[in-house]
Each structure stands twice: as structure tokens, then as C-alpha cells.
Amino acid sequence: NDVVVSEDIAQKELLGAFNGRVYFTGSVGTEHFLWETDGSNEGTSTIFEFDEQLPAIESSNLLSTQNDYLVFSTISNGETEFWRTNGAAAGTFKLSASGSALSSLVSIFACNLENKVLLRCFDSNGEGQLWVIDGTVDGTEKLADVNVFYLNSFPQDQHVPYEEKVIDGVLYFG
């Protein structure tokens, strides 16, 4: 079956499935929301309204799903914000403050490691960083500076292989 979502919702960005529902960001007029759907118009509803000062969500991406929450990022005005939701308004909140170290990062890899999400990122200077998110604001922190390559530094026709694997609770990447 095709998923039916109201045509009144603009700028839809699919996040993914979680706990039997599909989550996405979308706008109605100048207001920006986190939505959930079961695939029908009747089963589609907002669960959270983003900050009213947010002019527009340029993009949003699912980073990871855990047992009881999902982590996603939004980009607005060139700043990245990391969010988590458990599917309820009260369980949806920003993991990073505007202007914080996280707001300049672009995630190139996310994976689950035990009950946490690991992010391999680079900042606007191409400097690599490894971050961990445990689903709380206090548990969102930088683990290390890491030498990851800056994807834009390679010619467009050159494929640069990289891979990440979690084996026995250890993250390997290169």
C-alpha cells in the first residue's frame, strides 16, 4: 500500500519507522512539526512543534533508532540540531544547543553501540570528531577528535572507500 499523507504538509522529510509508525518532519504554513503516520490521512498527526523562531527546516535525517527512542538531525540556517523522540511530545527534545559545538557538525556515520548512538562527524573545517549520544542532553558529548577524511577534498570521480563495523561491542572504522 502507498502511504497517504496530506497534501497540506509541505517540505516533508522522511525519518523512518519506529514502534510501528513512520516519522517525518514537515511544515504547514510557517510552522514546522514532527509528524507520525500509520499510512492513512486519519492516522497522520503532529506530535511536536519545533521552535517558532525556526525559519525553515532545510533537511532532516534519521541517525539511529534505539529500543525506546529515535535520534535525528535537522538543519536550519546552516546549523545542525540533534533531536530525540520516543513518539510523544513530552519525549521529544533537542540534544544540542544552538551555537554549541554540535551545531557546526555534519554526521557522516551513525551506529548503535549497546544503548548509545555513536556519530562520526566533521565540522566546517573538515576536522573529524567522534560523538556519543545516550538519549539525554547530559549524555551527548564529544569522545575524541579523529582523523577522518573530508569527503569534499577528493576529486568527484574518485571513489573513497570507508567502512564502519561494530563487532562484539567495539566500533571499528577507517
Where are these regions (language model features)?
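Feature 14080 marks short, conserved micro-sites in well-ordered regions
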Residues: 1-174
